[in-house]
Amino acid sequence: MNDSYDVIVVGGGPSGSMAAWEVAKAGLSVCVLEKDRDIGCPVRCGEAIGHIGLSQFIEPKPNWIAAKITSVKMVAPNNTNVETDFKKESGYILHRRIFDYDLSRVAAEAGAE
């Protein structure tokens, strides 16, 4: 660990890891500070993400995907419901522990500490 860095990223979740990866790829020194002992544990929020949104940043790995989302059904308290089938874009339910950890490894391999 160095005494100084060009960038300090607070939080090693997906956003922090992606920020650290981009900074490291740009040739700057970066340190990620994470309060939890293990990246991706505990999971902080939902596991759903769209394929196009994720693919803009990184190609999804098969071991990240718990399930593929092809439709959504929303039901209101009064039982009114809306159902949508995704014809062009699908999404994923992610294994967040694996996903978060892998993103932190990508950042580390690019030079983030």
Give the predicted meaning of each segment.
Residues 56-72:
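A short alpha-helix-loop-beta-strand transition element characteristic
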